């Protein structure tokens, strides 16, 4: 890994929604430099999609393309178009971290191709295929990363929103069991119009339907908060918004805190990555947020019947920007190892 007194060199494999937003975020980081991008799309198209973003607005930088060089103001970035990560020149460019954001190389075997190409570490911007790969959520368990971890998963956007809620409730009150629901903006995995898809619900037009589908966040939470392993299940409702989502967590607790006590526990956990919100916000208010999770204190509630209590807590997130800033925090943390 990079020495602590020098800038770490990053390559991005896959320049889609996450890859481009990671690039935007890293432009402002003094200790991190994006050296290269690998994507099968033509560089001119990548440049256009980097500059103009329907959800997050225009990138106010001068962007040009010459041969296989993407130039942003005075900064030059190499653009490669290689299907096999093992053939990428990561050793030649002294790459410290590869951000693997294609969604294709999420197994240990796939991600390790970047290591074989000379990269020193790989951070997967998705849940990993194997549980043996360390899964981290910044500000919940990121300090478990060691210098020996060469492949890391930054989990999913929903897990990054859910994990602080589970961590706080488990630590302060103990979770017996529960379920979670994410009301989630539609994504590129869905169909714009009715068209074939392995998931028949995702086959339906994303912009005009509420689409029930799966989420791995509830089961993956045990990789981040081990004490909650096996205690949660959940699902997703994809809805017709471009970005901006909310998690509902319903749990039975070992203790019997009041709404105020639950909220105060969340407030104590607030940080640069976890916001405690007292305003009556809606999804558009969290678009482009840098917080991984935004706790909505106004929505905390309890249902009590015959002495049994069901607790509901809610947190917002921009399923693109919130996740990207969490991932970038993990990258910056790895630079210190």
Swiss-Prot record:
Protein residues bound to D-glyceraldehyde 3-phosphate: 156-158, 187, 202, 215-216, 238
> Which positions are catalytic residues?
157
Could you tell me which InterPro entries the record lists for this protein?
GlycerAld/Erythrose_P_DH, GlycerAld_3-P_DH_AS, GlycerAld_3-P_DH_cat, GlycerAld_3-P_DH_NAD(P)-bd, Glyceraldehyde-3-P_DH_1, NAD(P)-bd_dom_sf
Q: In which pathway does it act?
A: Carbohydrate degradation; glycolysis; pyruvate from D-glyceraldehyde 3-phosphate: step 1/5
List locations, semicolon-separated.
Cytoplasm
GO cellular component: a single term: cytoplasm
Q: What is its EC number?
A: 1.2.1.12
Q: Which reaction does it catalyse?
A: D-glyceraldehyde 3-phosphate + phosphate + NAD(+) = (2R)-3-phospho-glyceroyl phosphate + NADH + H(+)
Query: What Gene Ontology molecular function terms does this protein carry?
Result: glyceraldehyde-3-phosphate dehydrogenase (NAD+) (phosphorylating) activity; glycosylation-dependent protein binding; NAD binding; NADP binding
Keywords (A to Z) from UniProt: Cytoplasm, Glycolysis, NAD, Nucleotide-binding, Oxidoreductase
Q: Name one GO biological process term.
A: glucose metabolic process
Binding residues for NAD(+)? 17-18, 39, 83, 125, 319
User: For site (Activates thiol group during catalysis), what residue positions does UniProt give?
Assistant: 184
The protein's matches in PANTHER family, at most eight in alphabetical order, are given as: GLYCERALDEHYDE-3-PHOSPHATE DEHYDROGENASE 2 (PTHR43148)
| Entry's family note | Belongs to the glyceraldehyde-3-phosphate dehydrogenase family.
Q: How does it assemble?
A: Homotetramer.
Please explain the role this protein plays, according to its UniProt record. Answer: Catalyzes the oxidative phosphorylation of glyceraldehyde 3-phosphate (G3P) to 1,3-bisphosphoglycerate (BPG) using the cofactor NAD. The first reaction step involves the formation of a hemiacetal intermediate between G3P and a cysteine residue, and this hemiacetal intermediate is then oxidized to a thioester, with concomitant reduction of NAD to NADH. The reduced NADH is then exchanged with the second NAD, and the thioester is attacked by a nucleophilic inorganic phosphate to produce BPG.
- Which NCBIfam families does the record cross-reference, listed alphabetically? GAPDH-I
Record-given protein name: Glyceraldehyde-3-phosphate dehydrogenase
- Tell me the name of the encoding gene: gapA
């Amino acid at each position: 890994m990079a020495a602590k007194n020098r800038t770490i060199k990053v390559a991005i494999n896959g320049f889609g929604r996450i890859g481009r937003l990671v690039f935007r975020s890293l432009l402002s980081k003094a200790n991190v430099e994006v050296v290269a991008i690998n994507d099968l799309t033509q560089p001119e198209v990548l440049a256009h999609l980097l500059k103009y973003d329907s959800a997050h607005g225009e990138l106010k930088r001068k962007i040009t393309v010459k041969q296989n060089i993407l130039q942003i103001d005075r900064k030059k970035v190499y653009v490669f178009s290689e299907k096999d990560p093992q053939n990428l020149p990561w050793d030649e460019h002294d790459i410290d971290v590869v951000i693997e954001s294609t969604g294709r190389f999420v197994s240990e075997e796939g991600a390790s191709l970047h290591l074989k190409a000379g990269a020193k570490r790989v951070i997967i911007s998705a849940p990993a295929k194997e549980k043996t790969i360390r899964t981290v959520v910044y500000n919940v368990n990121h300090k478990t990363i060691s210098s020996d971890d060469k492949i890391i998963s930054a989990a999913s956007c929903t897990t990054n929103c859910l994990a602080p809620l589970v961590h706080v409730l488990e630590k302060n009150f103990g979770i017996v069991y529960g379920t979670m629901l994410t009301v989630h903006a539609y994504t590129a995995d869905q169909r714009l119009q009715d068209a074939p898809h392995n998931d028949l619900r995702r086959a339906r037009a994303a912009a005009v339907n509420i689409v029930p589908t799966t989420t791995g966040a509830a089961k993956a939470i045990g990789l981040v908060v081990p004490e909650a392993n096996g205690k949660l299940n959940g699902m997703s409702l994809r809805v017709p918004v471009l970005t901006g989502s909310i998690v509902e967590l319903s749990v039975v607790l070992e203790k019997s805190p009041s709404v105020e006590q639950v909220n105060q526990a969340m407030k104590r956990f607030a940080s640069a990555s976890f916001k405690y919100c007292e305003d009556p916000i809606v999804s558009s208010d969290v678009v482009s947020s840098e917080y991984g999770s935004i706790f909505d204190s106004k929505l905390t509630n309890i249902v009590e019947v015959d002495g049994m209590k069901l607790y509901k807590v809610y947190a917002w997130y921009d399923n693109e920007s919130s996740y990207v800033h969490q991932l970038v925090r993990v990258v910056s943390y790895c630079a210190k190892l």
